[in-house]
A protein has these predicted regions:
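Short acidic, hydrophobic short linear motifs in intrinsically disordered regions
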Residues: 164-183
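Short, Lys/Arg- and Gly-enriched loop/turn segments at beta-strand edges
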Residues: 37-48
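Short, cationic-aromatic polyanion-contact patches
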Residues: 206-229
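Short, structured beta-strand/loop micro-motifs enriched in basic residues and often containing a Trp
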Residues: 2-15
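A short, conserved structural fragment
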Residues: 195, 199-209
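Long, low-complexity, charged/polar intrinsically disordered regions in eukaryotic proteins
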Residues: 105-147
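Short alpha-helical segments that sit at the start of domains
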Residues: 137-164
């Protein structure tokens, strides 16, 4: 589970002619950690933002990076190409002329060697269309996310204690009690999912099957096994 940042990237409509009644400015941000929002949130965003934030909170980068359409780039219709692609499109390498200015403001697709990490949503005011990016920026240590957060931190601490540990050996560093009696059970597949989260959030690097901590400090370090006072 992830801490989510939403940031106003642009107004896709005509904010020069119609005001944003919430007073948003480019660069304004708000956050969600699974329990609380922080920052100013216009009610005109609720309908569009909740599915995006929910998916990003649960899946992090995985919410967007495997959407194949994100890597398609620009196309133009070309029926002669149907014998190749089955649909009749041809890649375009620049924005066609004669389009409204807002189309020219659209950023290019991610480079072919980078996976998409952000999603987006817009406000309900079609005159201004405030467009926010949405991305996972950290593991969530909110109380709702604690069971999974603690599992992730326990894995990180095993890697910190033994830099260069083989990824396949990490699970064996936990006792039977630690693996099977603490919820959620630390199964091989859960460890794999948590490792991906640690890598995505830049806590861990994996090189040639070996894991190394990056030195990034997590938002908190729970004292696992000790009662809270």
């Amino acid at each position: 589970m992830f801490k989510v940042k939403c940031k106003l990237g642009r107004f896709a409509g005509h904010v020069d002619k119609f005001p944003c009644h919430f007073g948003y400015k480019i660069g304004d941000e708000f956050y969600y950690d699974g329990v609380e929002f922080s920052g100013r949130i216009c009610p005109g965003l609720f309908a569009s933002m909740m599915p995006i934030i929910h998916g990003t909170f649960l899946l992090g980068y995985k919410y967007t990076e495997n959407i194949m359409f994100r890597y398609r780039g620009l196309d133009v219709k070309d029926p002669d190409m149907a014998k190749y692609d089955g649909a009749g499109y041809r890649p375009a390498y620049e924005v066609p002329g004669g389009l409204p200015e807002e189309f020219k403001q659209m950023g290019p697709p991610p480079p072919p060697n980078e996976r998409a990490k952000t999603s987006h949503f817009t406000c309900g005011d079609t005159r201004i269309l405030a467009e926010f990016t949405c991305e996972a920026v950290d593991l969530s240590d909110s109380d709702y996310a604690q069971p999974f957060y603690r599992r992730a931190i326990s894995i990180l601490e095993k890697i910190e204690a033994q830099p260069g540990i083989n990824v396949d050996d990490i699970l064996n560093k936990f006792t039977d009690f630690e693996k099977n009696e603490i919820s959620p059970r630390l199964s091989p597949v859960l460890l794999e999912v948590l490792m991906e989260a640690l890598v995505d959030m830049k806590y861990v690097e994996v090189r040639e099957g070996k894991a190394y901590a990056t030195g990034r400090e997590p938002p908190s370090r729970p004292k696992i096994g000790q009662s809270e006072e």
